[in-house]
């Protein structure tokens, strides 16, 4: 597959990594698994057995005219336990390496088809200057973008840190969710070659 950078230079990339047909079910499964794995899963509520107190019967069974009650910690009482209390849970799902690789191939290929992937020889700033980076992004027509480089340049990272809807990642940090989340993905040729190596 032949792609062109912003300056018009031709870049040849593998069809396996960047030309795969889009498989919506696969991408959905991998993205869902990734988001599920990001959940903390630490929420905890108390059942009637775990709430403090409520051991004694509040009033006798018969003769009071009131509804029968065995504990002041019943789920229908104020201050009682939860009927179906949430417990800590591991939400992570297993994703095979082959599936993950396939989903990444599908996403990258779809970004190219939708013209959301912008290839550049390199993207850098002379210092941690946000204004300079904003000007470069506007020049590329991508004010809201994910910038992917082979290695994160500290100046680039610091310049992008305060811009909403802009993030800088190196190839090892890129995941399916971040690729989908941004309007445009600005990728250096070196990063594209690294993806090609990893996904081909």
Curated annotation (Swiss-Prot):
GO molecular function, a single term: rRNA binding
Pfam families assigned: Ribosomal_L4
InterPro entries with a match to the protein in the record: Ribosomal_uL4, Ribosomal_uL4-like, Ribosomal_uL4_dom_sf
GO cellular component, one term: ribosome
One of the protein's GO biological processes: translation
Signal peptide residues on this chain, from the entry's feature table: none
The keyword Ribosomal protein is assigned to this record: yes
Stated role: One of the primary rRNA binding proteins, this protein initially binds near the 5'-end of the 23S rRNA. It is important during the early stages of 50S assembly. It makes multiple contacts with different domains of the 23S rRNA in the assembled 50S subunit and ribosome. Forms part of the polypeptide exit tunnel.
Segments for region (Disordered): 45-64
UniProt name for this protein: Large ribosomal subunit protein uL4
Oligomer status and interactors: Part of the 50S ribosomal subunit.
Keywords from the named record: Ribonucleoprotein, Ribosomal protein, RNA-binding, rRNA-binding
Similarity comment: family membership: Belongs to the universal ribosomal protein uL4 family.
């Amino acid at each position: 597959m032949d792609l062109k950078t912003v300056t018009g230079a031709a870049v040849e990339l593998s069809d396996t990594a960047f030309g795969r047909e889009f498989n919506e079910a696969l991408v959905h499964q991998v993205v869902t698994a990734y988001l599920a794995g990001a959940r903390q899963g630490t929420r905890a509520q108390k059942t009637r057995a775990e709430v403090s107190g409520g051991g004694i019967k509040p009033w006798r069974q018969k003769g009071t005219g009131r509804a029968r009650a065995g504990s002041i910690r019943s789920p229908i009482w104020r201050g009682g336990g939860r009927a179906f209390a949430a417990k800590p849970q591991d939400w992570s799902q297993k994703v095979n390496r082959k599936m993950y690789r396939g989903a990444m191939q599908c996403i990258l290929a779809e970004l190219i088809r939708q013209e959301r992937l912008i290839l550049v020889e390199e993207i850098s700033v002379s210092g941690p200057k946000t204004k300079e980076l904003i000007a470069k992004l506007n020049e590329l027509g991508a004010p809201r973008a994910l910038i992917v480089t082979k290695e994160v340049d500290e100046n680039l990272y610091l310049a992008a840190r305060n811009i909403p809807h802009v993030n800088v990642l190196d190839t090892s940090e890129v995941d399916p969710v971040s690729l989908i989340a941004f309007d445009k993905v600005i990728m250096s040729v070196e990063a594209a070659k690294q993806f090609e190596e990893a996904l081909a």
